[in-house]
């Protein structure tokens, strides 16, 4: 992996391409991020950089993290994430990473925490089939069979059941950068990305390239 940045999802809009077609895009405030830590093969066993994004009040940061930032000489950041990189020599602690590291047409993977939907049944959560709705049926939106009888006398793990839907780490692969506005730290990405507005996302080169 060569490039990565952190950002905040601002919402969705639409733009027009050169043929006049409407393209739905997600607006991301990408950076400026700062390199908080470098990890090397000799010291840590692998090569990576830790970058931070978004200012935060001092009272909201615990003592270990304050020491971590003080050691790097970097101001406190709200969102920290580590990325494995091949070209670690190109980065230094305190270096800024801005939106212009990406260009129009780049293929990227975007990770974030999906929107929480609360407690949902199997029809919405797992797209299960509904039961008969006619008179006489008592089975409409229920779970249905959860396993066999006396053997094995239990419900297997990972059975698709009602439960908390969403609010999980989600990655959308192979999206395309529609436009970069470096002076405003804005990246427009074709299509949707995980999470509600104002949520944090990470953007990196796609693994599918």
Swiss-Prot record:
Biological process annotations from GO: translation
Annotated stretches, region: Disordered: 130-154
GO molecular function: rRNA binding; structural constituent of ribosome
Keywords: Ribonucleoprotein, Ribosomal protein, RNA-binding, rRNA-binding
Natural source organism: Clostridium kluyveri (strain ATCC 8527 / DSM 555 / NBRC 12016 / NCIMB 10680 / K1)
Quaternary context: Part of the 50S ribosomal subunit. Forms a cluster with proteins L14 and L19.
SUPFAM superfamilies: Translation proteins
RNA-binding as UniProt keyword: yes
UniProt gene name: rplC
One GO CC annotation: cytosolic large ribosomal subunit
Name of the molecule in the record: Large ribosomal subunit protein uL3
Family the UniProt entry places it in: Belongs to the universal ribosomal protein uL3 family.
Database matches in PANTHER family: 50S RIBOSOMAL PROTEIN L3, LARGE RIBOSOMAL SUBUNIT PROTEIN UL3C
Keyword Ribosomal protein set for record: yes
Its biological purpose: One of the primary rRNA binding proteins, it binds directly near the 3'-end of the 23S rRNA, where it nucleates assembly of the 50S subunit.
Entry superkingdom: Bacteria
